[in-house]
Amino acid sequence: MYGDGDYRRFWGLRVLAVDGSKVALPDTEDVRAEFGTIAYSGGKDNEIQGERPWALASVLYDVLNRVALDAALGEARAYEVELALGRLAHTREGDLLLMDRNDPSYRMLAEGVRAGREFVVRGSAASFATARRMLRGEGPDRQTVTLEPCDGQRADIQARGLPMAVRVRFVRVLLPTGEFEVLATSLLDEAKYPAAGFLELYHLRWGVEGFYGVLKTRLGLENFTGTGAEAVRQDCHATVYLTGLESILTADALAALDAKETRHAQQVNRAVSFNAIKNQALGLLMGGMEAGPLLERLTELFLQNPTLVRKERKPPRKKPSDRALLDFHRRRKKHCF
């Protein structure tokens, strides 16, 4: 895919989302010692108290080509920005990093500048002063400013050899809900990177949220095959690898569906694709079958029962009750096993 340059880009850049997510782990002494725990409470008057092991996953995900380039599991209380910085080593020139509002620290931006990577980061109400003012609706929609570390960070930034000043462009976009969103970016050229395109660009970040959904629901990541720390890591990396394999194997089927003239765009049904790969994976990976006929058969299966893409469909987000979630996971959730 990347070797021959035949992959999707936005503004000529490979778009990579960096994001973290909590992963529930088996409750064993080995896992507790390796990853740590997080306390929980619940019930009326919080009479239910306890703690259980978790990990913080960090993924570098190509949102346009649906491939995870790198993934790591950190401790339960790991700093998400620190984990995200570890993914920089797996990027290259011509990459654009999309990051959520958990990541807009000066160090994150400075590390991106030092590595020569472009970035777009969503600003929060607790981030840079310019972003806070723009979120309140103050000032122009586009501002280019020079950021410097605060007094508490200055010594650490200097010790790390990071730039003490970073030139950043802030772009304010209006969401369909009527709310403002402020994005901080290293893409300073307004002619080459017009402000009107940033809403579409940042919306691509939802691809990594969907990726975590596939890992945790469709592939049942948290249903681990072992109870030790090493088994947890192996399951995590095997599951991420499987998603990349699925993306590569379904590329021809996706191209065929894109070429069809239909009312709504179509895409491969991932319940079908993962099930087909599961049944044929050993023959494909172990070399027990001829690759050509096997890939043709898989493509035929991938083209069955495609799902429709309705971009204009925006159902309201709901927060289900614990009872509804338990019912879903026990009785309704579809697995690819």
Residue ranges, per PLM feature:
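Single, function-defining residue in the core of a domain
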Residues: 5-14, 18-337
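Short, basic alpha-helical nucleic acid-contact segments in DNA-binding proteins
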Residues: 1-2
